[in-house]
Amino acid sequence: MSKFLIKLITLYQKWISPLKGQTCRFYPTCSSYSISAYNTYGFFRGTYLTIRRLLKCHPFHPGGFDPLK
């Protein structure tokens, strides 16, 4: 399941993200963070970390450097 989600995220990075421009307020980007989370922790924990990161990605959060721990 993780590999399927990584493929979807990669498709997003290749085809959709360039159309939107650079909008992520974090480094690494949320999609790169997600791929790292799935590769490192697998499906369940990777999904949890991805959702937690996406919930922080809004205009009222300062963003910045937020690596995978």
Curated annotation (Swiss-Prot):
Query: Which InterPro entries does its entry note?
Result: Membr_insert_effic_factor_YidD
Topology term for the membrane = Peripheral membrane protein
Q: Does the UniProt entry include the keyword Cell membrane?
A: yes
Presence of keyword Zinc: no
> Which UniProt keywords are present, listed alphabetically?
Cell membrane, Membrane
Q: What SMART domains does the record point to?
A: Haemolytic
What PANTHER family does the entry give?
Answer: MEMBRANE PROTEIN INSERTION EFFICIENCY FACTOR-RELATED
What family does the Swiss-Prot or TrEMBL record give for this protein? Belongs to the UPF0161 family.
Role, per record: Could be involved in insertion of integral membrane proteins into the membrane.
Q: What is this protein called?
A: Putative membrane protein insertion efficiency factor
